[in-house]
Amino acid sequence: MAKYTISKHRLEELQLELREILDVKWPAITKQLQDAREQGDLSENADYDAAKNEQAALKKRKDEIEEILENYELIEDVMRSTDEVSIGSTIEIYNYQKDHKEVITLVGSMDSDPFANKISMDTPLGKAVVKQKEGSEVTVHTLALPYKVKIIKIID
């Protein structure tokens, strides 16, 4: 099974979310279902239907989190080199198409946040820059149009 590469912070968030589901949300939804059953006929019971739908969504999220927690690798545990771009690296790149410099951090898919310039290794840009060295020019292959970037500096 594939591993999820996540940060320690994201791991802690997932553990807290799972704990809240198991200790707070699941008992609450179980109580809602019990109360709805006591109302009688379940065939036309909107409260029961809503609670069942919420329970299904909660179970799906619980299963997703458990899958991640059973198959993760911490970013901090991945061997990093300052000679080449790897997960956790912060780099300055120059995008030739946009005539624009930017600083990005390469992260696992669970930690990506494009608005904070945290780019997943699984994106076209992430795949293009990983294992590259300072000064490398790479082509980023996207569905729309490929473009070139230069790795100006590996900051961290």
UniProtKB/Swiss-Prot annotation:
One Pfam family it belongs to: GreA_GreB_N
This protein's UniProt keywords: Coiled coil, DNA-binding, Transcription, Transcription regulation
InterPro entries linked: GreA/GreB_C_sf (IPR036953), TF_GreA/GreB_CS (IPR018151), Tscrpt_elong_fac_GreA (IPR006359), Tscrpt_elong_fac_GreA/B (IPR028624), Tscrpt_elong_fac_GreA/B_C (IPR001437), Tscrpt_elong_fac_GreA/B_fam (IPR023459), Tscrpt_elong_fac_GreA/B_N (IPR022691), Tscrpt_elong_fac_GreA/B_N_sf (IPR036805)
Claim: Transcription regulation is one of the keywords in the record: yes
Regions annotated as coiled coil: 1-84
SUPFAM superfamilies (UniProt xref): FKBP-like, GreA transcript cleavage protein, N-terminal domain
Keyword check for DNA-binding: yes
GO MF entries: DNA binding; RNA polymerase binding
Family: Belongs to the GreA/GreB family.
Known function: Necessary for efficient RNA polymerase transcription elongation past template-encoded arresting sites. The arresting sites in DNA have the property of trapping a certain fraction of elongating RNA polymerases that pass through, resulting in locked ternary complexes. Cleavage of the nascent transcript by cleavage factors such as GreA or GreB allows the resumption of elongation from the new 3'terminus. GreA releases sequences of 2 to 3 nucleotides.
Name this polypeptide is given: Transcription elongation factor GreA
Species the sequence originates in: Ureaplasma urealyticum serovar 10 (strain ATCC 33699 / Western)
This protein's encoding gene: greA
